[in-house]
Amino acid sequence: LIRNRESGTWEFHSVTQYAYQPASLLLEEGKSKFNQHNFYTDNSAAYLRKHNGFTQQYKAGIQGERATLKYTPTKQPNDFNASHLSLYLTPYFQLERGKWLTTLSLPLKAERYFSQQRSFLFFNPSTYLRYKLDYHWAFSLYGSLKRSAGDFSDLYPGLYQTDYRTWRDGNGLFPTNTTQTYNLYGEYKNTVQEFFITAALTYSRSNRNTLFEQSVSEDAIVYTRRELPNHSDSWNLSSTLSKGIYDWHLKTSLTLLLSRSNGEQLTRLADSKGNQQSLLQTYRYDYLKAEPKIIWSPADVFEAEYHATLGYGGSKIGSDTRLTPLLDFVQRLHLTFSIGQVDLRLSGEHYRNDLGGNTHLN
């Protein structure tokens, strides 16, 4: 419902939905059933005002969800409830002056989980700044800070099976996460020359209060949630370069991605005497990806498209263990013939994946 006034615009929004999600896992040992019921409602009111390039909006609402799960076999908690109610307020501001545009969003939410008897104050402030030098050049900067809780499956306190050999145990803990994200972006475009280039640098850091401990045996992998403050961070540098040649009916592009991820992992191991102990290790993963693409359309009745993906990644665990870098290469070729209103397409794909130990799969 929207009401326009001279001083601004009022908007009233209400949504209610119900979802039933049955799932089952059938194995030789027996059958596990997950019957999940979700009743969700969100009701809000918002006020919007624009004046002389300045926009302000204030939104307030109440949000609730009744989420229940019945799990079989009954040796685990079979009637789980993660119902919660929240009150939220979201002020938003935008200012545009000439070549500059800036925004500020300040969401704030107070949330209560009834069965867990826990209350939280969540937030997600973010800001965005854009500078458009001229028609060709534009730059932007973005930053955000978000505190959130785990989803429905994260809150389940017991042990449950996800596939034929993987188990997860919430261990009765309540996971929370605080993430900060920063992004720097730039672009250049020249439509006359059909030349475009973009580049982005993104950094993200997450701080968590829990960490999954991994235990591996011959017939099972068990992930048990432990109360252990930890963090992870990642860097991503990406760029896309595209060039079209109109006279040749040709379009080309190249996308490059370079990323690095760091974090901590917890593994449960047995010593020489058979005693179980937990080992906390740092890890690092580096990845490089290149995607060239060519589209050639010399006539209305024919088009050829070539698309390749080249990925190269390597890992480091602790201070001594370095895993062999692996190369993945995928090539795709599509030939399209148009006869009247009928399109005939021939496609071919080639895969080459490194498996380690100087072996690969084609």
Please annotate each region the language model reported:
Residues I2-N362:
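Exposed, low-structure sequence patches enriched in small/polar residues
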